Amino acid sequence: MEVYVPLRRIGVILHVAKDGLMVARVNSSKADRLVGLVTMDYSMRRIGVIKDIIGPVNAPYALIKPIKGLNATDYVGKQAYVRDIDYDKVMRR
């Protein structure tokens, strides 16, 4: 039996930086609150953790630290998600 967990799209992964962090364009206007959330792909596989938000307020980017053993370049061009319940929790802060 599969459990349905709603996901919230946070943005698309654009590239992998030299230090190994993935850079994703964030769709949320309150992106600073996303730091610390676990990111996933559409299949609910963990990708990594949002470590920082950079760029201008109206066009933010998230720096995602990939989990160990993950080939980050495989996710370039793909959407990144967080669990809806986690997203709602941090947006209420």
Annotate each PLM feature.
Residues M1-R93:
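Peripheral interaction segments used for macromolecular assembly
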